[in-house]
Amino acid sequence: RWHDVDTDDFVARLNQFYADTRFHEFYQQHQEFYEEGLRTYETNVMQYFHQEWYARFYGTEPTEKFRVVIGFTNGGGNHGPHRQLSDLPKEVFAIVGYYVNPQTGKAYEKGLDYASTLIHEFNHSFVNPLLNDDSNIGMLKEIGQNLLKLSPIGMQRQNYAQWNIVVNESIVRAAVIIYMLDNGFSVEQQLKEIFDNVCRDFRWM
């Protein structure tokens, strides 16, 4: 989302901020809080995330490195930045929001609600490269354009206004449902996933 940014200047300023605010001391003072958040996420959310399924389902290893970061100061929002270092696999980050139930004071109580984001995003590591193949573009372009015509406003609102993005998102969302079938999710959980997609204008799910 950043354009024409001097990254060297940004990193220099970030390092200066780290020093000026004595951030390392702040982290040490709150280390138990962060570690408890990680333990809770591991227990409540990661139990639903079975990374070995992906290579088995797609028949290939991922071409990207997938990393999960808890955004303790981000509220409930999720972000998906990436970086490409020379001669190294592309790294894709799922920066997941930190949410605490205000009634109970506990974090990530409904683990599946948060795991679905990981399950979805990791599928993109396998699905997105498919449209780098010209033969796949030839087969899927017309389909993607037709799907886009079925729900142009809904797709536009979600920044999915290009046929290739609609194809990627559709395949990923279908793969999530198959993931749930293969990993013993309840019928209610599967139906909720389908219903959520229909509500997001992916009515062909």
Model-derived features: positions:
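Non-catalytic architectural context of zinc metalloproteases
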Residues: 1-44, 61
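Stable alpha-helical elements in mature extracytoplasmic
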Residues: 10, 37, 50-53, 114, ...
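Auxiliary, metal-adjacent structural segments of Zn-dependent hydrolase domains
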Residues: 30-92
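Second-shell loop/turn segments in exported
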Residues: 35-44, 104-108, 113, 157-163
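Short, flexible loop/turn elements at secondary-structure junctions
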Residues: 58, 70-74, 99-100, 123, ...
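Active-site scaffold of zinc-dependent metalloenzymes
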Residues: 79-112
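Post-HExxH zinc-binding segment in Zn-dependent metallohydrolases
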Residues: 129-201
